[in-house]
Design a protein with these regions (language model features):
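SAM-dependent methyltransferase catalytic region
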Residues: 1-104, 110, 114, 123, ...
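Short, amphipathic C-terminal "tail helix"
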Residues: 351, 355-365
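Flexible loop/turn segments at secondary-structure boundaries
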Residues: 45-46, 83-84, 261-264, 363
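C-terminal substrate-recognition regions of SAM-dependent nucleic acid methyltransferases
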Residues: 28, 32, 111-281, 288-350
Length: 365
């Protein structure tokens, strides 16, 4: 549950947030019947790790309790992370996307359009839930304070368990999905591929720094890191590796686990190839390769706008976990890839090509 002290304030500044989400019958506590619920609920509580990945979202608890009260209308403004990710939001997302009473979503890619001067990675949205509505949702998308698109559509499509926020991307997604190819995510490791993410204790989120050196010794292997306020290459004993020992002597590609902020116009995944006898910190994910040539061809694919476009459909924060690659199809990596080649393979129209080109790195020379 949520810590009561976070939401009970001094007299005169009393907060009803705790009562609303914890009382079995909050209507009795408030001495009122709820016909319309409108709100901007608390977004998260900190668990010792600040405002980043360790901040536990709680806004979903207010939405769930509001729906349970069965008013006629609910409208709340919340972070948009729940569309495709967010810590502990999987069940909430599943319920929301299956709820046919979701009549409208107004999605702001940049949260500062609603809250000037405030950064909320992934943007914010407000929704209209209507007890008497049953149908597809009308999705409004805003960029730079302007309405960019509006579409009445399902919240979920076959083969996905997330909300694809960009209306104009739906037909492109369907066209690519029709090829029924394996997902690129199957090639990408899970978090912390070599087991270096060790914390002081279950309640203390401070990291235990791996014992690595900057000079090579006889029994050491290469150690790629991107944390502790710097990045580079160190050396570490193979004995310090806690899992996936079989990956140490493979040729592999490393990709960062955190990239940008969820902004398709600037976020860029930059892969790099590392030779065998190597490992990395938990700030990277690993793509195993059978040869140097295959690794080069995979990198050529990752560097395309096409690839980044499909990642963008699931990546709305800085997190670039294995899951964000789920909608990206695998290719034949006996050959290299370019955007032109990919657009032709999937039969994209010129309008669809222009959409991708303008969404992903539009200012690229």
């Amino acid at each position: 549950g949520v810590n009561k002290k976070l939401y009970q304030r001094n007299k005169g500044l009393e907060s009803y947030a705790y009562s609303f989400i914890h009382e079995d019958k909050p209507e009795e506590a408030f001495n009122m019947k709820f016909d319309v619920i409108i709100g901007n609920p608390p977004y998260q509580m900190n668990d010792g790790g600040g405002m980043g990945a360790s901040a536990m979202p709680i806004y979903q608890k207010f939405v769930e309790k509001a729906i349970k009260l069965s008013p006629t209308y609910i409208s709340m403004i919340v972070p948009s992370r729940w569309f495709a990710g967010g810590r502990g939001l999987k069940d909430f997302r599943k319920k929301m996307l299956a709820d046919k009473r979701m009549q409208e979503i107004h999605d702001f890619i940049d949260a500062s359009d609603c809250f000037p001067g405030v950064e909320i990675k992934g943007g914010v949205n407000f929704f209209l839930w209507n007890k008497n509505f049953d149908g597809d949702c009308t999705v409004h998308t805003y960029e730079s304070s302007q309405l960019k698109s509006k579409m009445k559509r399902p919240l979920m499509f076959e083969g996905t368990d997330v909300f694809i926020r960009y209306n104009d991307s739906i037909e492109i997604f369907k066209k690519i999905k029709s090829f029924e190819e394996k997902s690129f995510s199957q090639l990408v490791s899970g978090n912390d591929p070599f087991g270096f993410d060790i914390r002081v204790s279950p309640t203390d989120y401070r990291r235990v720094k791996p014992k690595y050196a900057l000079k090579k010794s006889n029994e050491s292997i290469l150690f790629y890191y991107n944390n502790w306020s710097k990045e580079g290459i160190g050396y570490i004993s193979e004995k310090e590796v806690n899992k996936n020992h079989h990956l140490i002597n493979e040729i592999k590609i490393l990709v960062p686990k955190a990239v940008g902020s969820g902004d398709a116009s600037t976020d860029e995944i930059k892969p790099f190839i590392v030779e065998s006898s190597s490992c990395c910190s938990e700030t990277y994910l690993v793509i195993k390769c059978s040869s140097k040539k295959e690794a080069e061809n995979i990198c050529s694919y990752i560097k395309t706008k096409f690839f980044h476009f499909l990642v963008t459909l699931l990546k709305n924060t800085q997190g670039a976990y294995q899951k964000v690659y789920e909608l990206v199809p695998q290719q034949n990596f006996d050959e290299s890839w370019t955007d032109k080649k990919l657009y032709k393979k999937y039969g994209l129209s010129q309008n669809q090509i222009d959409y991708i080109e303008n969404l992903v790195w539009p200012n690229e020379d």
